[in-house]
Structures are given as C-alpha cells and as structure tokens.
Regions:
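Conserved pre-ATP/AMP-binding loop-to-beta segment of ANL
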Residues: 6, 21-22, 137-162, 182-191
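Conserved AMP-binding/adenylate-forming core of the ANL superfamily
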Residues: 14, 24-54, 61-71, 75, ...
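Conserved ATP/PPi-binding loop(s) of AMP-dependent carboxylate-activating enzymes
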Residues: 318-322, 334-364, 397-402
Length: 492
C-alpha cells in the first residue's frame, strides 16, 4: 500500500496502528513483543511525559541499543513533536559530549540496565524509559509538526574527520522509506530483522521507521556481531527482510546455520563495498543473493539498490524513485557522460536541508541542490550506479594519484586488508598495508600484489606490509578510516 509522503511520521504511525491494532508489531531478543496498539500506547506514554515535563526542550537524546524500548522511545519523541537524537554510545565520551553540546541536549532517554552494562557517565539528565509512570496522559496535546519539521539529528560516522550533525525531516524519511518500498515492495506478512543501531542512518530510517510505516513486523537485537543470537532471532520470527553490511554478513556466513536464514527473501547491504568474495561466500552458505545498495546519511540514507529481479554485479543498483544522480568532474562539477568516472552528486526528496548549525559546511556540501558525496563512480547506459572509491581514499605518490581500493581488492581472497597513505619526505606519501591474517607472511602478500597486474607505483614495499590483530571498524561494520589511519601511522 502506498504511503503518504506529505504527512508526518507520527501521523503515519497512528494510522498504521489504528488500522490493525491487534497485529504483532515489534519484538526483540529479550522476548519482549508488542502489538501495534501496545506499541502506540507505550509511545504515547513517553510523548505525554515529554510534553508535561520537557515542554521547552526541542531535542531529546536517546542512548539505547536497537530494541523494543529504543523504538518506543523514538516513537514517543516523534509523537511529542520533538526531534530525536540517537547517541553513538560506542564512540567515546568526546564524541558523545560534542553531540550533546551541539544539540543542546538536557534530557536523554535510556534504561537502567543499559547504562549499567555500558558503564557510561551521566552526561545529561538520564531518564529510564521503563521508569516513566504508566498513568501518564497521552500525547493528544502535542503541537503537530509539519512534514518539513526536523524528525531526527544523526551524525556522520566521522571516518574522515569530526562528525557533523545531520538533520532529517519527516518528509526526508517518509520519501526514503517510500522509495525503498516501491523498489522492493514489503507486505504486512513480512518481518524485518533489525540489528543496526538507530544512531546509524541505515538503522534509523530502514530498521526503525520503514517496517512500522509499511505494516511489517520487526525483530530487534542490539549487537550486530552476536551472530548466534541473530540466527536464533531470524529463525524464531521467520524474518524475511534484513539490512546489514558486508562485514557483518561475512561473519554470519561463518557462524549461522543455513536453516536459520531460510525464511529471508531480501538482504540489503550497504555502508561499504560488497566484494565478490563476500557475496559468493554468503550465497554458497545460505543460497541467498546479497543486494548491494548505496547511500549517505545526508541523503536519508538510501540512494540506490539492486533487486532480485534487476541487478548488475559490481553495481549498487539503480537510484530509488525521485533520486537524481549526477556524475561530475571532481574539480569543476560539470556533468559527465555515462561510463565516465567522476564525483557522485545526488539530489532528491530525502536530501537533508543542511548540516545542523553549520551553514558554511552546508554551502560546501550542497551545490546547485545536489549533495556532493565525496565518492567516485559512474553510471552505465542503463542507469546502474557503480561506486569505485572515496576521493579521500587516494594517495599522491610522486605526483600521481594512487587509489587504495584496487590494492585491497587484489588480496581480498587471501585476507581482509586496509591501505593508508602516511607522510613521506621523499615522495609526499607512502603506502602502508595492514592485514589481519598473521599466519600469512607479509612476503606472500607482497608476492600476490606483484602478480596482480597493478602498476608498480601502487604496490606497497615489503617492509610496509604489516599483520595486525584487527582493523578498526565502526558499529555499522565499515572501516573506521580515522582510527585505521592512526594504526597505520603507528606501525609505519
């Protein structure tokens, strides 16, 4: 059923709940399950408390892993006409304090059990959602926001610098959810397996809001690395829709029994490049194709996705309905023809209005209505998008630009790896290669690179190839570029 994109998230939430109040709605790995009516009732209790006790606060924080409680907290904030700010509880105090200060957070919704497990200091007034009074007045008196009101403030992953506040409106999220629904239509018989955190845009839009907006059930677990629990959860709830990342999917292919994922129909992966070796390993184990997609937090996040009936190997699919993708010269931003590689620019109804309290950053990032992604790629003649690298993932050696991704791909069947450029007095930069399979000698890695047909300039020296325990990753599963570069500098 097509959903209105000129409404608000709260209006759509109520409409779905009132349409079939007794249908199961949300569940999690703790065993908690709510019907649509119960979900709405609990969200209204949160909203009522916020309206009575936090009337003057525009932004409300949330510090919870993906769960029924986290969903209810976010829905309650929305019903109260306020803005949800889901905090990245894995990023450390400095990142969290910066987010709290930028958004002026005075209240953070959490739970006693979660705080105790996390060991996080009280950085604002921490309110345990489970302790809110059950007799609280419902949210009937909430000021009704408009579709252009800010629904949430997310933060960039900070892989290449200081995280930025990214506001998304009700209209942004509704349009993005509708775009995915038109590309891969769900039904009320479907169940989403939701394991990505709500502070990640992929998790916020597509695991928190997409299921409830389209009448799907959803089953949550708060740690995407808990393969055993995720397998049990998928089997128990007969999950059909799953959002993940290639890194996590590779773990699942090695730790989850094939029958546990047998009900899954659609597995969408994003946040990093889907390598052929990972896709092949997953299909061999589960018999399911991974569907590569592409997005950015600033774009809602969804931009493009492959489907089971329309896919191109190596691509991230065609743009979602209403999304305009332009490939441009990185220096001049002049449009390029199909097949030509350039900077990926994107516009559409899910594009953020601008960075939060950062007009200069917004002017740099949005040109002629298009968001400048910082990613390089091309469109083929049929409109399929191919992402080749991030512009930040190049090194300048002796005046020549050297991409890091082809080097990593040359040894991806041997070992996970990461290439970074560190300062070098003679050549400007020097390539450092980190890999995580210490039983393979660095000489073998070097030999494989020499045989891969890469230009000699692209191949790190033998002494610059280092085995490490792990390559730092973000909660989304993609490489934490900043920390990985710091690791490369420390060993190089």
């Amino acid at each position: 059923m097509q959903k209105r994109t000129d409404a608000t998230l709260g209006e759509q939430l109520r409409r779905v709940a009132e349409d079939a109040p007794d249908r199961p709605a949300i569940a999690d790995s703790s065993g908690c399950t709510l019907t649509r009516a119960q979900m709405l009732q609990q969200a209204e209790l949160v909203a009522g408390w916020l309206l009575e006790h936090r009337c003057g606060e525009e932004n409300i924080g949330v510090c919870l892993a993906a769960s029924v409680l986290a969903a209810v907290a976010n829905y309650g904030i929305t019903l109260a006409g306020k803005t949800a700010v889901n905090l990245n509880f894995t990023a450390g105090d400095q990142h969290t304090r910066a987010a709290i200060e930028l958004c002026g957070l005075k209240t953070i919704l959490t739970s006693r059990a979660f705080l105790a497990r996390l060991g996080m200091p009280a950085l604002a007034e921490m309110i345990s959602v489970e302790d809110l009074p059950s007799h609280q007045n419902a949210a009937a008196s909430a000021a009704c926001p408009s579709p252009e009101s800010i629904a949430c403030i997310l933060f960039s992953s900070g892989t290449t610098g200081v995280p930025k506040g990214i506001p998304l409106t009700h209209a942004n999220i509704l349009a993005n959810a509708e775009g995915l629904a038109r590309r891969i239509p769900p039904s009320d018989a479907d169940c989403m397996l939701g394991v990505l955190p709500f502070f990640h845009s992929f998790g916020f839009t597509f695991a928190l809001w997409f299921p409830v907006l389209h009448g799907m059930r959803v089953a949550y677990h708060g740690n995407p690395t808990d393969a055993r629990i995720i397998g049990d959860l998928a089997e128990k709830h007969k999950a059909t829709y799953f959002l993940s990342t290639p890194t996590f999917c590779q773990q699942y292919a090695r730790k989850i029994e094939p029958h546990q994922f047998s009900s899954l129909r659609y597995i969408l992966v994003g946040a990093e490049k889907l390598r052929g070796s990972v896709a092949g390993e997953f299909k061999d184990h589960f018999g399911i194709e991974l569907l590569a997609g592409y997005g950015c937090t600033e774009l809602g996040p969804g931009v493009a996705v492959n489907t089971p009936w329309e896919a191109r190997p190596g691509s991230v699919g065609r743009p979602l309905e209403g999304i305009q993708v332009r490939i441009a010269n990185p220096d001049t931003l002049e449009p390029l023809a199909p097949g030509q590689q350039g900077m990926i620019l994107v516009n559409g109804p899910s594009r953020m209005p601008g960075y939060y309290k950062a007009p200069e950053l917004t002017r740099q990032a949005i040109r002629d209505g298009f968001y400048v992604t910082g990613d390089l790629g091309y469109l083929d003649e049929d409109g399929f998008l191919y992402v080749t690298d991030r512009i930040a993932r190049f090194s300048k050696l002796g005046g020549e630009m050297v991409p890091h991704l082809p080097i990593e791909e040359a040894i991806c069947e041997l070992t996970p790896s990461f290439v970074a450029g560190i300062p070098d007095e003679r050549r400007g930069e020097r390539l450092i290669l980190l890999y995580t399979t210490p039983e393979i000698p660095a000489s073998v890695i070097h030999e494989r690179l020499l045989k891969a047909g890469l230009p000699a300039l692209w191949i790190p020296k033998r002494e610059d190839i280092h085995a490490v325990t792990a390559i730092p990753v973000l909660p989304s599963g993609k490489v934490d570029l900043r920390r990985a570069r710091e690791l490369a500098e420390s060993v190089g």
